[in-house]
A protein has these predicted regions:
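C-terminal functional module detector
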Residues: 1-174
Length: 174
């Protein structure tokens, strides 16, 4: 008798987040086209991961060519803590009984309080040069960890890859 409710949890697939200038379709598609996106299968955090080069800031999703060591700025803001139950508008198109049956009164119902970000972990991936190259040292998960002080405003850090110019290889960070 729980099959309908349980089925919604088996393949949730996570959430996609898009940096956009608005909530309209055109703004969201523009953010997707720029690849200013990230995914989360957990809390609904806010995340910025930017390359800081001279006076230029390139947002996540940007492809660029560099000869010097890259410098990054990462900011993460915690998800809203959830209030019990469902918001009032949840039952405008569905009866309270049906909402209780399907959701067991568990809805997205954010408070004004955000969870704290305890740390930021950065992963570094360097693609293979040849099929014979061992990938064990190319995927560094986790490459760098930065501890964060508790704050409702989130956590912001900057770091540099001091090996990039020396290694002179394509690299992906996230």
């Amino acid at each position: 008798f729980e099959a309908e409710r349980e089925a919604s949890f088996f393949t949730t697939g996570g959430l996609a987040a898009v940096h956009s200038s608005g909530r309209d379709r055109e703004s969201i598609w523009a953010g997707l086209t720029r690849k200013e996106t990230y995914g989360t299968s957990g809390d609904r955090i806010l995340l910025w991961f930017d390359l800081v080069s001279d006076e230029t800031i390139l947002p996540m999703g940007t492809t660029t060519t560099l000869a010097d060591n890259p410098r990054f700025r990462v900011k993460a803001v915690g998800a809203f803590e959830q209030k019990d139950g469902c918001p009032d508008y949840s039952s405008t198109n569905i009866s309270q009984e049906e909402l209780e049956r399907i959701c067991k009164n568990e809805c997205y119902n954010p408070s004004d309080v955000r969870k704290n970000i305890s740390r930021i972990e950065v992963v570094k991936i360097t693609p293979q040069i040849s099929n014979n190259e061992n990938v064990d040292n190319l995927i560094k998960d986790t490459w760098k960890t930065f501890e964060c002080k508790p704050s409702q405003q989130g956590c912001e850090i900057e770091f540099e890859d001091n090996e990039f110019a020396e290694n002179s290889r394509d690299t992906i960070y996230y």
